[in-house]
Design a protein with these regions (language model features):
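Class I S-adenosyl-L-methionine-dependent methyltransferase catalytic core
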Residues: 1-61, 66-86, 90-346
Length: 346
């Protein structure tokens, strides 16, 4: 039986596939409209109120405030971002075929748009996927461990608001840097609305710059610094002066981003302040990058920090059923568990 070639080429990138199921123009436009539909402001505010009372669920917040910028980012293993995929009908016809083969995962009573959103999360490998968010439960636990009485927390790669919201609900002052101006604007709006709907005064300081750039006003102020920084080219954001793009050399990235970030964190931390980092080895274009060893080596060779401990980050959303898929398709190496390494300033 001859395998049908339905390879897709768009924006100079190609995705090899035999799958395609035609969509009418009306169906295609309806799918795009549904996937781009956001939660309402009231739904997002309800999430904010629940978060202030201890909840870790924030899907409505992400959907309302962050969806546009989130959809512009793409996994470095994939051909397109969700934003790009939605703009090209053949890509949606590929996903239309994917959702037609398993009615348990993609039930017929749900719309095509809803099922394709699920497919972005479960089976978009090499084509396009939704970028993950850092689990709020984990940052809650870290802040309650290292800042039980409050203090100043520096998040050196802001991400999708989970760490900022955790700091806000735990009564911790939040300092965040990120080069993505659209993200920073969204975080400012989240903070303002959180204060309004919860009646809470938060202490949030946001800087629209990369962590490799020194910010004098933070020097000597920080008690605890933690983030889940870019895993080299595993995720590409393409907004603002990002630390890397598809053409960035790995060793140059270590020299120009990781090393100055570590130096800056040292300057920001108070005496005996804590520096923690979530890192994991990755595979991009069949090349394995040993981020764990390389970044820990840089930290230890700096002579500025003493190793304290590690914490497990259980992230089942990155598990794809086998060691092969975990290593070669998700972009993460062998195990799905990730580690948080903790150091103390010396």
């Amino acid at each position: 039986m001859t395998k049908v070639n339905n390879d897709i080429t768009y924006l100079g990138r190609t995705f090899k596939t035999s799958l395609s199921k035609p969509l009418t123009d009306v169906e295609y436009n309806d799918i795009v409209t549904e996937i781009r539909k956001k939660p309402t402001f009231d739904e997002a505010c309800d999430d904010l109120i629940r978060i202030s009372k201890g909840s870790t669920r924030m899907s409505k917040v992400v959907g309302y405030y962050l969806q546009d910028v989130l959809y512009k980012g793409r996994n470095g293993q994939d051909a397109w971002s969700i934003d790009e995929a939605l703009s090209y009908k053949p890509i949606m016809e590929y996903f239309n075929a994917k959702i037609s083969v398993n009615d348990k995962v993609y039930p017929a009573h749900l719309s095509k748009g809803e099922n394709i959103k699920t497919a972005f999360r479960l089976c978009g490998i090499r084509c396009c996927r939704k970028l993950p968010n850092f689990p709020m439960k984990t940052i809650d636990e870290l802040l309650q461990t290292y800042l039980p009485n409050g203090g100043n927390y520096y998040d050196y790669s802001c991400g999708w608001a989970s760490r900022m919201l955790s700091a806000m609900k735990n009564g911790v002052s939040y300092y965040g840097t990120d080069p993505n101006n659209e993200l920073i604007d969204a975080l400012i709006n989240i903070n303002g609305d959180y204060q309004e709907v919860t009646g809470t005064d938060t202490d949030v300081h946001l800087f629209n710059t990369g962590s490799e750039v020194f910010i004098p006003e933070m020097e000597g102020k920080i008690d605890f610094s933690f983030s889940s920084p870019p895993y080299f080219t595993l995720e590409l954001y393409n907004i603002g002066n990002q630390s890397c793009n598809e053409d960035t050399d790995y060793n140059e990235w270590l020299d120009n981003y990781i090393k100055p970030t570590i130096d800056n964190i040292y300057k920001y931390l108070k005496e005996d302040g804590i520096f923690a980092i979530n890192i994991k080895d990755i595979v991009v274009n069949k090349i394995e990058y040993h981020l764990t060893d390389d970044i820990n080596r840089i930290i230890q060779e700096s002579g500025k920090f003493e190793f304290v401990t590690t914490h497990d980050l259980k992230n089942i959303k990155r598990t794809f059923g086998s060691r092969y898929w975990a290593k070669h398709e998700t972009g993460l190496s062998d195990k799905a568990d990730e580690l948080i390494f903790v150091y103390k300033k010396i």
